[in-house]
Amino acid sequence: MEVKIEESWKEILKAEFCKGYFKRLVNFIKNEYKTKKGKIFPPPKLIFNAFDSLPFKDIKVVILGQDPYHGKRQANGLAFSVNSDIKIPPSLQNIFKEIERSLKIQTIPNGDLTRWATQGVFLLNSILTVEESRPSSHKDIGWEIFTNEVIKIISKNLNNIVFMLWGNFARGKKELIDASRHLILETSHPSPYSAHNGFLGSNHFSQALRYLKEHNKSPIDFQ
């Protein structure tokens, strides 16, 4: 299985890659891609796209998702993001709607969030792979152990990071983050089922930009 990951992450996570659970996870995932050709998302080379798109030291904002989109050609390894030629999913539509409302800007009608990642937004799903049409199909195979460790490493080794936790699943990660050195923003999930329960009107993006400015970090263009 081809895995692409940025060099600084390779160094930071090398101990994790050597652990027994991770080796078992890799073997499981390799077998899934081999036996279910074209049915596991994202493509192998994009599994670690969130890491490959952003060096560790350049992280400014962390947005946590659950697992990748499970439709064909949707998932591109970045939480909430889809390939540029794919229709924008409802949750991402609501994210754009909140950005436009709170920042008074016009978002680009393109669901590929690589443009955010390259500016310092770490778009991390807790589970990094999924089987077609089976949401959460790769739950409890080891990904959560790995990504929980990633969150703890960010919290421990960086300062003044904005963590956006949307929905009960993401909010459950709050205990992994040191609130004394980072900004934790919590609200409902941007899904159409819950966006009106807090997400729309949360002002998370304006709060994030204000926090970055207060800590002398360059702003992010959320268009």
Curated annotation (Swiss-Prot):
Active site location = 67 (proton acceptor)
Keyword DNA repair attributed: yes
Residue ranges the record marks as coiled coil: none
Q: Where are the transmembrane segments?
A: none
**The keyword Metal-binding is annotated on this UniProt entry:** no
Disulfide bond residue pairs: none
Provide a Gene Ontology MF annotation, just one: uracil DNA N-glycosylase activity
Q: This protein's superkingdom?
A: Bacteria
Question: Entry's InterPro entries?
Answer: UDG_fam1, Ura-DNA_Glyclase_AS, Uracil-DNA_glycosylase-like, Uracil-DNA_glycosylase-like_sf
**Under the cellular component aspect of Gene Ontology, which terms does the record hold?**
cytoplasm
**What PROSITE patterns does its record include?**
U_DNA_GLYCOSYLASE
Tell me what reaction this enzyme catalyses: Hydrolyzes single-stranded DNA or mismatched double-stranded DNA and polynucleotides, releasing free uracil
Enzyme class, first EC level, given as a word: hydrolase
Subcellular locations according to the entry: Cytoplasm
Its EC number is: 3.2.2.27
Annotated GO biological process: base-excision repair, AP site formation via deaminated base removal
> What does the UniProt keyword field contain?
Cytoplasm, DNA damage, DNA repair, Hydrolase
Family from the record: Belongs to the uracil-DNA glycosylase (UDG) superfamily. UNG family.
Q: What does this protein do?
A: Excises uracil residues from the DNA which can arise as a result of misincorporation of dUMP residues by DNA polymerase or due to deamination of cytosine.
Q: Which PANTHER family match?
A: URACIL-DNA GLYCOSYLASE (PTHR11264:SF0)
Query: Any idea what this protein is called?
Result: Uracil-DNA glycosylase
State the organism's lineage.
Answer: Bacteria, Pseudomonadati, Spirochaetota, Spirochaetia, Spirochaetales
